[in-house]
Amino acid sequence: MRRIAVMGAAGRMGKTLIEAVQQTPGAGLTAAIDRPDSSLVGADAGELAALGRIGVLLSDDLAKVADEFDVLIDFTHPSVTLKNLAFCRKHGKAMIIGTTGFTVEEKQLLAEAGKDIPIVFAANFSVGVNLSLKLLDMAARVLGDDVDIEIIEAHHRHKVDAPSGTALRMGEVVANALGRDLQEVAVYGREGQTGARDRKTIGFATVRAGDVVGDHTVLFAAEGERLEITHKASSRMTFAKGAVRAALWLDGREPGLYDMQDVLELR
């Protein structure tokens, strides 16, 4: 059995991850961690996820459960994830990282840690989203510079980073396929007298409202026709199942920084 720990286990995504782990053959939740000031520390992780008691109590410190897991799943905050990354690197633990909002410099720290431990880092662990990335690469290469490209994403009102990590990853895939640098061509929102659109740019539009789990559309607009590639998530479980799938895939892997394209063999 693959021994899995979940960081941020008392949160919405954490509870969904606990459920996904317990539903997956070959995986087992052996540790659950949340922030030290959580009033739920000491509670049974299974009861937090409405599964009934499973005998795993919520801890407030990763170090206290260091001997109880093989791989840590972390969907928290960059500052928290980086601390956990240092811990896992020191103790030889694999990691699944679904945290978004990293800076370029922070992503480099993930790559450095990948020299010592196996890591799967992805902006989105949904199988559908990762298939969409493959389709986006194909579409961009075929359509080339003859289209205007816009990325529209929507998430729930509690999401703190924008654009979403998935939207940015979609932009990177499209830009790379076209030989462009996303940092140079990205346009984040428009207002006022913007002038005519530069064909080389890739636009981003962000919506934050209600309980939207995650909607992403990439628009390729040409003269006379439009191609839209859209993915809509209706449940966090799709991300959680992908993360657990990645955790099982990492078993026996050499150190390295992998992503879901590797897990799904889409390269």
From Swiss-Prot:
Q: Which GO terms describe its molecular function?
A: 4-hydroxy-tetrahydrodipicolinate reductase; NAD binding; NADP binding; oxidoreductase activity, acting on CH or CH2 groups, NAD or NADP as acceptor
Q: Which residues bind NADP(+)?
A: 35
Q: Superkingdom of the source?
A: Bacteria
Q: CDD domains, from UniProt? A: DHDPR_N
Can you list the GO cellular component terms from the UniProt entry?
cytosol
The record's top EC class is oxidoreductase
Q: What Enzyme Commission number(s) apply to this enzyme? A: 1.17.1.8
Q: What is this protein called?
A: 4-hydroxy-tetrahydrodipicolinate reductase
Taxonomic lineage of the native organism = Bacteria, Pseudomonadati, Pseudomonadota, Gammaproteobacteria, Pseudomonadales
Point out the gene that encodes the protein.
dapB
